A protein has these predicted regions:
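Substrate-binding groove of N-acetylhexosamine-processing glycoside hydrolases
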Residues: 1-139, 187-199
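Active-site lining segments that contact anionic ligands and/or coordinate catalytic metals
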Residues: 43-47, 125, 136, 156, ...
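Beta-sandwich strand segments
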Residues: 71, 177-179, 321-326
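Hydrophobic, well-ordered secondary-structure elements that form the walls
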Residues: 71, 141, 169, 245, ...
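Short, compositionally stereotyped local motifs that mark structural "simplifiers"
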Residues: 91-231, 250
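Short proline/glycine- and polar residue-rich coil/turn motifs
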Residues: 161, 285-291
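Aromatic, loop-rich ligand-recognition surfaces of beta-strand-rich domains
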Residues: 214-278, 293-327
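Solvent-exposed serine/threonine-rich low-complexity stretches and specific carbohydrate-binding patches
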Residues: 276-287
Length: 327
């Protein structure tokens, strides 16, 4: 079973829905016959299924947008043997299929042309990776805030960014823009592109210069699941005067995503001895306030001179019984 309620493309472009991705290619690549099945089970498979929940849909067109063209990929895996699958050929057929959808006035997603970005601190810079699931699409970009056109620089490899800028990019086929323009405001501060050490492999997101969106599964939020106390350390690589520490937190009440009850900052010049420099605490009422929103939580450090900043966050524990997701 697969869920069409999940995002079908880079989440920055998509209307609000459930968490996680299930792109056109994800569905096309899905293999219903699992590797650990006994050989005799494969012949008993009656078909494939995709579920479409509609709690985020307000009109029939919203449903159509989530169903089409992914329904074609579902049909493809139902009647095509795995060894005969060919993504490039499928896309050519998809172009014809989408023309039929247009002729019938059906609202469908063009998410296959949108760009997925990954920004990673590396060697003192931010390395920006741009991808599209369509191999026939070229990516053109600008760094001066202007809109990308077919004659803008062609993206060929990761871009190195070392300053605040607005990176814009879009996909083009035969000189025509096909996807939406991706706008990445890269912001630089004392922690940007600096190393982070902790227990979460995604902690590099904390210093990659990109703000997360209101979609908490957009691959720009660093999350800790079932872990009530976490800690990470930012190495600014030299002594710096720090007046304020600010961290962004997202609340998604319906998915039980909440800020911690305590954020504590400690500083060190040698990464061995740390001194407490400030903290913020939050009440249960503040933590479990309903809604879907982003907060910048600032803690004054009073101009302290430091190289290492250790951040410790402690959660409140389980959601209360009157929460939409208690426990």
């Amino acid at each position: 079973i697969m869920y069409l309620i999940r995002y079908q493309g880079p989440q920055w472009f998509e209307p609000q829905t459930y968490f996680g991705n299930n792109t056109l290619k994800d569905i096309y690549d899905y293999e219903p016959v699992q590797a650990d099945w006994k050989p005799e089970y494969a012949s008993l498979l009656m078909g494939v299924q995709a579920s479409m929940w509609t709690e985020f849909c307000n009109k029939p067109e919203d449903v159509d947008y989530l169903v089409f063209p992914r329904l074609a990929a579902l049909a493809e895996i139902a009647w095509t043997q795995p060894e005969k699958k060919d993504w490039t050929s499928f896309l050519k057929a998809m172009d014809i299929y989408n023309e039929h959808l247009t002729a019938k006035g059906i609202v469908y997603a063009r998410s296959m042309y949108n760009i997925q970005h990954t920004v990673t601190p590396e060697d003192g810079a931010l390395k920006v990776k741009l991808e599209c699931i369509r191999p026939d699409a070229e990516i053109h970009y600008t760094t001066d805030g202007s809109e990308p056109i077919a004659t803008s620089p062609l993206y060929k490899e990761k871009l190195a960014v070392k300053e605040t800028l607005n990176l814009k990019s879009a996909t083009f086929v035969k000189g025509r823009q096909m996807g939406k323009t991706l706008t990445l405001p890269v912001r630089w501060n004392l922690a940007t592109a600096k190393p982070v050490s902790g227990c979460n492999p995604n902690e590099k997101l904390l210093t990659n210069g990109i703000r997360g969106s209101l979609k908490y599964s957009d691959f720009e939020w660093c999350s800790w699941t079932n872990n009530d106390s976490i800690s990470f350390t930012i190495d600014m690589e030299k002594m710096e005067k720090v007046n304020t520490f600010t961290i962004g937190c997202i609340t998604s009440y319906g998915m039980a995503v909440h800020k911690p009850r305590l954020i504590e900052i400690a500083v060190s010049g040698d990464n061995k001895t740390f001194d407490k420099a400030g903290e913020r605490t939050f009440t249960p009422e503040e933590i479990f306030r309903e809604g879907n929103y982003i907060e910048d939580i600032s803690i004054s450090l009073g101009g302290v001179e430091t190289r290492y900043i250790r951040v410790t966050a402690k959660g409140i524990g389980k959601c209360p019984d009157n929460h939409v997701r208690p426990g």
